C-alpha cells in the first residue's frame, strides 16, 4: 500500500513507536524525509538510513516547526507531505488530574500539531500535498482516567476535518489516523499485566497492533494513491471501535458462544 518514491516528507515524533516505524516505511519506499524528535539521542537510529535528515527540537516551539519545513525544502525540494505524530500521554481523571498535566498534554498534542500544520501548509500551498495527523481511538471514544489525552486527541481529529475543509481548494488533503492499542512506549506499562490482558480480550482481533501496521496506513495517506481521501478519521485499532463496548459480546466469546 502506498508509493512515496521521491516524496519530500516531514515526520514529527520520529524517535520511537509509530513515528519511527513511519520513517522506516517511508525510507523503504524511497521518500526523502526530515525526522523530528525532542532530542538528538532519540534520533541516532537514523544514521543508517539514506535520504533521511534529522532535527532535534520541541514541536511546541513555532521556530522548530518552521525549521523542519525549511530543512526539508532546502535539502530535498518542495514539501509533499507532513506526518504530525508527536504526542504524549499522562494518566489522570477529571477529579484528580492536575491542570499542569492537562496543559502539558494539550501543548504537545494540540498546539504542536497546529503549529506543524500551519508551517506545512505554507510550504505546500503552491502545489498541494498531504498531511496525516496521528489521532487515536481516544479521540473517537472516551476513556476512564485519560481526560487530558481524550480532549487532546478529540481536538486533533476534528482539526483534521476542519483543515480538510479549509485547504481542499489548495489541493492539500488532511486526514487523521486513529490507532487503538499499539505496542509502543505509551502502552509498554500494560503489556503482560492484568490490564493489558483485559484490553487484548476486548479487541476483536485479540491482540495489540504493531507500529508498522499504523505506518502502512500513514504511508498510504502521504502517497498519491489516497488522492481522493481527505477529512477522514481512520481507525487502525483491531476493531475496537466497531462495537458498542457492551460486555455481552466479549462474555459470549469467552464462554464459547461466539
How should these model regions be labeled?
Residues 176, 194-229, 236-238:
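C-terminal helical subdomain
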Residues 15-16:
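Conserved glycine-rich cofactor-binding loop
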Residues 93-94, 98-103, 199:
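Substrate-binding pocket helix/loop in short-chain dehydrogenase/reductase
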Residues 117, 152, 160:
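Active-site helix of classical SDR
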Residues 122, 165-166, 227:
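Alpha-helical segment proximal to the catalytic Tyr-Lys
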Residues 136:
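Residue(s) in the substrate-gating loop at a strand-loop-helix junction
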Residues 168, 173, 229-231:
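Short, small/polar-rich loop/turn modules that mediate ligand/substrate recognition or access, typified
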Amino acid at each position: 500500500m502506498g508509493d512515496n518514491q521521491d516524496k519530500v516528507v516531514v515526520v514529527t515524533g520520529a524517535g520511537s513507536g509509530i513515528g519511527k516505524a513511519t520513517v522506516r516505511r517511508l525510507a523503504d519506499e524511497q521518500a526523502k524525509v526530515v525526522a523530528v524528535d525532542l532530542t538528538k539521542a532519540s534520533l541516532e537510529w537514523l544514521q543508517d538510513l539514506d535520504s533521511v535528515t534529522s532535527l532535534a527540537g520541541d514541536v511546541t516551539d513555532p521556530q522548530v516547526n518552521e525549521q523542519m519545513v525549511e530543512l526539508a525544502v532546502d535539502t530535498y525540494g518542495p514539501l509533499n507531505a507532513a506526518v504530525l505524530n508527536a504526542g504524549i500521554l499522562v494518566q489522570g481523571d477529571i477529579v484528580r488530574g492536575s491542570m499542569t498535566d492537562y496543559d502539558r498534554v494539550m501543548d504537545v498534542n494540540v498546539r504542536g500539531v497546529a503549529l506543524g500544520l500551519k508551517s506545512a501548509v505554507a510550504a505546500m500551498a503552491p502545489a498541494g500535498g498531504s498531511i496525516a495527523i496521528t489521532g487515536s481511538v481516544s479521540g473517537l471514544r472516551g476513556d476512564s482516567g485519560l481526560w487530558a489525552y481524550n480532549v487532546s486527541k478529540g481536538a486533533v481529529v476534528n482539526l483534521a476535518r476542519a483543515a480538510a475543509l479549509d485547504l481542499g481548494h489548495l489541493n492539500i488533503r488532511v486526514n487523521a489516523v486513529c490507532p487503538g492499542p499499539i505496542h509502543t512506549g505509551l502502552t509498554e506499562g500494560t503489556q503482560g499485566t492484568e490490564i493489558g490482558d483485559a484490553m487484548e480480550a476486548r479487541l476483536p482481533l485479540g491482540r495489540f497492533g504493531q507500529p508498522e501496521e499504523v505506518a502502512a496506513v500513514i504511508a498510504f495517506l502521504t502517497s498519491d494513491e489516497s488522492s481522493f481521501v481527505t477529512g477522514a478519521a481512520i481507525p487502525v485499532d483491531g476493531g475496537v471501535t466497531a462495537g458498542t463496548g457492551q460486555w455481552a459480546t466479549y462474555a459470549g466469546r469467552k464462554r464459547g458462544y461466539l
